Curated annotation (Swiss-Prot):
Family classification: Belongs to the anthranilate phosphoribosyltransferase family.
Gene3D superfamilies, per the entry: Nucleoside phosphorylase/phosphoribosyltransferase catalytic domain, Transferase, Pyrimidine Nucleoside Phosphorylase, Chain C
Oligomer and partners: Homodimer.
SUPFAM superfamilies xref list: Nucleoside phosphorylase/phosphoribosyltransferase catalytic domain (SSF52418), Nucleoside phosphorylase/phosphoribosyltransferase N-terminal domain (SSF47648)
Positions contributing to Mg(2+) 1 binding: S93, E227
Catalytic activity: N-(5-phospho-beta-D-ribosyl)anthranilate + diphosphate = 5-phospho-alpha-D-ribose 1-diphosphate + anthranilate
Residue numbers binding Mg(2+) 2: D226, E227
Gene this protein is translated from: trpD
Residues annotated to bind anthranilate 2: R167
Cellular component annotations (GO), alphabetically ordered: cytosol
The protein's name in its UniProt record: Anthranilate phosphoribosyltransferase
Species annotation: Leuconostoc mesenteroides subsp. mesenteroides (strain ATCC 8293 / DSM 20343 / BCRC 11652 / CCM 1803 / JCM 6124 / NCDO 523 / NBRC 100496 / NCIMB 8023 / NCTC 12954 / NRRL B-1118 / 37Y)
Residues annotated to bind anthranilate 1: G81, N112
Length: 341
């Protein structure tokens, strides 16, 4: 009996797969050894049962093993979200990543084009003039030169070609929506992860711990955003050296007023790129800038660049005021172009 057949029989009776079995099945999928109908049945079986931690861990390990690797001498972090919140906001985590890198924390952002929104990370960066399709060597050079780089998921996970059309035809979230933020080829040990549903916060914190992540904050806005939100409170799962605790973040505790979700709305990649650049340049203040600051602050805090959330918020603000966040965009733009010239 093949791995996929054994897995399907297990899923048929609503039992969880071990991480070893999930890894074997994903290895077979990534090697092109599983038929489209079997892949579809497998994804449906996992989704119907709800993916277990063991299944996510095993699948993530297989995906990372099949990814192009990028060796790095830097201790870089990732700021990433699952997407799928259908909110239509501007590219919050992408904007925050420039603030974080500008504050001196190297960032390796791993992302893709939009799936359920108008503008994914790759779309926005491309509209900002950043060259997104880099080889591992080029991405490493950009990180060394700019303190920040971008790994285009489509390029670094070539084996995903075996599931792309199936995912589109199914039309619902699958385990791959969850795996995206977990499969950065650099295996960062520090992360800020946005999650589209509260029920995944603690399970994904456990997954990250199993994958070797040491410090992470997983966030889900109570308004549904897979970001730290400014419209209401944000639910958190905080991972620190294998220990996980839940918390709630309220921006009102830090002097911010709640805003409407409409005030955070973005648009096309070009429109979102303009929003990001204007926030970094200080031309946009208010709800959008404050939301980017809050997300950057939690990233700076978990990266131990600031000793408290208050100090992290102040550092994020200073990075905008003194121009280093905007300079970070310029550095990423010029460095990514230079290595591909």
């Amino acid at each position: 009996m093949s791995n996929i057949q054994e897995a399907l029989k297990t899923l048929l009776v609503q039992k969880n797969l071990t991480d070893d079995m999930a890894q074997k099945v994903m290895n077979d999928i990534m090697d092109g050894k599983v038929s489209d109908p079997e892949i579809a049945a497998y994804l449906m079986g996992l989704a119907a049962k709800k993916e277990a931690v063991s299944e996510i861990v095993g699948s993530a390990r297989a995906m990372i093993d099949h990814a192009k690797t990028i060796p790095s001498e830097f201790e870089a972090m990732d700021i990433v979200g699952t997407g799928g919140d259908l909110s239509g906001t501007f590219n919050i985590s992408t904007t925050a990543s420039f603030i974080v890198a500008g504050a001196g924390v190297p960032v390796v952002k791993h992302g893709n084009r939009a799936a359920s929104s108008k503008s994914g990370t790759a779309d926005a960066l491309e509209a900002l003039g950043v060259t997104i399709d880099l080889t591992p060597e080029q991405a490493t050079d950009v990180l060394a030169n700019a303190g920040q780089t971008f790994l285009f998921a489509r390029s670094f996970h070539p084996a995903m070609k075996y599931v792309g059309s199936i995912r589109k035809s199914l039309g619902f979230r699958t385990i791959f929506n969850i795996l995206g933020p977990l499969t950065n080829p650099t295996r960062p040990r520090t992360m800020l992860v946005g999650v589209y549903t509260k029920e995944l916060l603690v399970p994904l914190a456990n997954v990250l711990s199993e994958l070797g992540v040491q410090e992470a904050i997983l966030v889900h806005g109570q308004d549904g955003l897979d970001e730290v939100t400014l419209t209401t409170k944000t639910d958190l799962a905080i991972l620190s050296n294998g220990h996980i605790r839940e918390a709630t973040f309220d921006p009102q505790d830090y002097g911010f007023d709640y805003v409407s979700i409409e005030s955070l709305q973005g648009g096309t990649p070009i429109e979102n790129a303009k929003i990001t650049e204007h926030i970094l340049a200080g031309k946009i203040t208010g709800p959008m800038a404050d939301t980017a600051i809050l997300n950057a602050a939690l990233a700076l805090f978990i990266a131990k660049k600031a000793q408290s959330i208050d100090a992290a918020i102040q550092l994020a603000r200073e990075t905008l005021i003194n121009g280093t966040a905007l300079g970070q965009l310029g550095a990423l733009r010029s460095s990514s172009r230079a290595v591909t010239a």
